[in-house]
Amino acid sequence: WDLKHEKRGSVRASLFFIALAIATFYYQAIGQGYLLNPRNRYSSLWAQMIGVVVPLFLFVLANWCLTTLFDGEGSFKDVFIACSYSLAPIPLLVIPATIYSNFCVSAETDIIGFIGTLAFIWLGILVFFGTMVTHDYSLGKNFVTILGTLIAMVFIMFIAVLFTTLIGKIVSLITNIVTEIQYRM
């Protein structure tokens, strides 16, 4: 409500929440205890950035495209701010769980998994109600819109893969044509 009607949200703060979520997942990847990360698999900051930014951007884009067609009141910026602010539970719960993972025994690893699951459930609830308030939808219409957004995300990913493959084929064709012309000369 405050983000939409009282204009308390900003893009700068949204970018801060995104950076905080990326840093949290990076810390989780390198800071988990041995019980949860026995092979010392570390992830790069780049991988964590892609893992946060790409799904967020896909959701915001798909939601904005879909709600533009179905009388949504939110702009792209409003949807971005609402979804970015929804990332707040991630550092609040994942960082303490990661710290706790260094001291827990094997019987307590389920608690850490539960805390991580709780963070994502809280995130989902915030995204759901944030988009509902942003677009001024009823509960049922927002539920249908969220399902449509998820389908649109899959469709956008399919189009992106198709486009990337097509560009690769065109580059390969041009390379083959240039190679054949060089052989003929």
Feature roles, as predicted:
Residues 1-77:
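Selected alpha-helical membrane-embedding segments in polytopic membrane proteins
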Residues 3-7, 84, 178, 182:
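Generic secondary-structure transition motif, activating predominantly at the C-termini of alpha-helices
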Residues 4-7, 77, 141, 169, ...:
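Context-gated lysine
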Residues 24-52, 96-120, 154-185:
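Membrane-helix interface segments in multi-pass membrane proteins
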Residues 63-158:
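Hydrophobic alpha-helical transmembrane segments and adjacent short intramembrane/lumenal linkers
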